[in-house]
């Protein structure tokens, strides 16, 4: 930890006072404070106070954007490719304990020729997060940056494990665990992929998050983002309406999608229940081999259909049918098998 200058102390105190007075921060102020949080420059008491003040008032777009830019600047670098690539990620926190739909969709999309740099972490709120199920499937989630980029180039998918790139998060860990409540860090997770993709399918646990994420991605110059909330899920829903915020070419459009828009009938959410990592790994293995249930295949088809839209495949009904056909070939399982060799 560096010696704190008088200027640093005054600036930090001014920002904290502003937060405690219920005043919003500018993007620059948010970048300053979060840049210093991940350097370990704030005391636990200061950090706890800042996080609670932000949570109680509600984080602004400026604050989220400033925090994202600071955390990306502090992250270990990932060499982003020149070709188009996307991320598919969820906030978690929907408490539904479904199978890992986003992870399966990422693998299927890669087997169809799309490039997916999937950013993820260990589960906090569900039984099995992306990294938990991938580990159970035999994937080395701690592959080096070079290996991850090689996998992205060669087989179309890389897993970027958050803990390996955001080393400064350790400074916030004890406070976050002590608070035992969602903070701005839960909002930031899906936005801080170090590969910095400009295309993203993002699932959120609450419909109230659609607008903040869409507007933040607009500020972050995303080319095409689709943010979804599906009837309580941070995925596209097989059991009801999905609320959507789509950012494209600097404009945000809000609309709803039903299973019928993808060519399907609604299915019960219960059919997607998962469990521990080993159980979810077995389900995903069968699914990627074309031996999953109709409902599981439908969930992956609907989510992958929107992922395909980010790459210019506009007809989501046609996309969903292509995904179902792809699942029957077993090629998605081949892609997973290749991923385990990196």
From Swiss-Prot:
Pathway: Amino-acid biosynthesis; L-tryptophan biosynthesis; L-tryptophan from chorismate: step 2/5. One of its GO terms (molecular function) is magnesium ion binding. Binds 2 magnesium ions per monomer. It is an enzyme of class 2 (transferase). GO terms for biological process: L-tryptophan biosynthetic process. Anthranilate 1 binds at residues 90, 121. Keywords: Amino-acid biosynthesis, Aromatic amino acid biosynthesis, Glycosyltransferase, Magnesium, Metal-binding, Transferase, Tryptophan biosynthesis. Mg(2+) 1 binds at residues 102, 235. Catalyzes the transfer of the phosphoribosyl group of 5-phosphorylribose-1-pyrophosphate (PRPP) to anthranilate to yield N-(5'-phosphoribosyl)-anthranilate (PRA). This is Anthranilate phosphoribosyltransferase. It comes from Mannheimia succiniciproducens (strain KCTC 0769BP / MBEL55E).
């Amino acid at each position: 930890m560096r010696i704190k200058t008088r200027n640093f102390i005054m600036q930090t105190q001014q920002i904290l006072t502003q937060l405690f007075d219920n005043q919003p921060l500018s993007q620059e102020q948010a970048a300053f404070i979060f840049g210093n949080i991940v350097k370990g420059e704030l005391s636990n008491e200061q950090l706890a106070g800042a996080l609670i003040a932000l949570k109680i008032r509600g984080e602004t777009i400026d604050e989220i954007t400033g925090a994202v830019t600071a955390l990306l600047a502090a992250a270990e670098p990932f060499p982003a490719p020149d070709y188009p690539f996307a991320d598919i990620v969820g906030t978690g926190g929907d408490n539904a304990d479904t199978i890992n739909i986003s992870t399966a969709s990422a693998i299927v999309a890669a087997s169809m020729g799309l490039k997916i740099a999937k950013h993820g972490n260990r589960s906090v709120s569900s039984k099995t997060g992306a990294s938990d199920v991938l580990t159970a499937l035999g994937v080395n989630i701690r592959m080096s940056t070079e290996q991850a980029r090689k996998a992205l180039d060669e087989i179309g998918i890389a897993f970027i494990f958050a803990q390996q790139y955001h080393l400064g998060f350790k400074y916030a860990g004890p406070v976050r665990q002590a608070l035992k409540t969602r903070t701005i860090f839960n909002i930031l997770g899906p936005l801080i992929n170090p590969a910095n993709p400009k295309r993203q399918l993002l699932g959120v646990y609450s419909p109230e998050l659609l607008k903040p994420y869409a507007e933040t991605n607009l500020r972050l110059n995303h080319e095409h983002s689709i943010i979804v909330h599906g009837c309580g899920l941070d995925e596209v829903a097989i059991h009801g309406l999905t609320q959507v915020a789509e950012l494209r070419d600097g404009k945000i459009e809000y609309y709803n999608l039903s299973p019928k828009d993808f060519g399907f009938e609604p299915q019960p959410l219960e059919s997607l229940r998962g469990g521990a990592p080993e159980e979810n790994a077995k389900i995903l293995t069968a699914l990627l081999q074309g031996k999953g249930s109709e409902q599981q295949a439908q969930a992956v088809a609907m989510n992958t259909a929107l992922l395909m839209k980010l790459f210019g495949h506009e007809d989501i009904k046609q996309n969903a049918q292509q995904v179902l056909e792809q699942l029957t070939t077993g090629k998605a399982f081949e892609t997973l098998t290749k991923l385990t060799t990196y």
